[in-house]
Amino acid sequence: MENQPKLNSSKEVIAFLAERFPHCFSAEGEARPLKIGIFQDLVDRVAGEMSLSKTQLRSALRLYTSSWRYLYGVKPGATRVDLDGNPCGELDEQHVEHARKQLEEAKARVQAQRAEQQAKKREAAAAAGEKEDAPRRERKPRPTTPRRKEGAERKPRAQKPVEKAPKTVKAPREEQHTPVSDISALTVGQALKVKAGQNAMDATVLEITKDGVRVQLNSGMSLIVRAEHLVF
């Protein structure tokens, strides 16, 4: 008997589950909420198939249920399904709210990463001198003055007005920030700033978690930020 091919990544496992249970899993588009306890059903149904282990199934389920398209599908009125697509009860309000918060946090993280990447690109471009200097204006040839005839009186040269040196404009002093060294010293409601490249955005502490600090920006967006991106 030939050996079955082995699935090496969670994405490959999800593709296999979408083909094996098309009424439950989907490889693209909006996903349907899964039955609570579906992991054990998977272990019972696909044990040994494609050399899948429980660890692989658990990792694939975690990736599937944290994807944006799955979180979009967790909404009021949606129904959970089992492996065969049979309904297994409507979603409760607590699960819907949890999915909504996860989706907002994921979007905020992506937006912060994009802002940081754009700031780094601008810094790199400035350092490399990618901006081209304006082209120099061509000099016009100086007009030739007629030579003075012998015996003619020399006209006195007009004195040039003394030009005043232009006043130097002092560059605005760059705002200094103090990094946050200990997040346990922070308090809920405390004002601080979130660094994004060379910029620092005003924010307020909402919660201190094991992964970092949940803050709310002035725009109303909330996100979890690591300590190295926080300053006073």
Swiss-Prot record:
The gene is proQ. GO terms for molecular function: RNA strand annealing activity; RNA strand-exchange activity. Residues 117-136, 147-177 have a biased composition (Basic and acidic residues). It comes from Shigella flexneri serotype 5b (strain 8401). The keyword Transmembrane helix does not apply. Belongs to the ProQ family. This is RNA chaperone ProQ. One of its GO terms (cellular component) is cytosol. RNA chaperone with significant RNA binding, RNA strand exchange and RNA duplexing activities. May regulate ProP activity through an RNA-based, post-transcriptional mechanism.
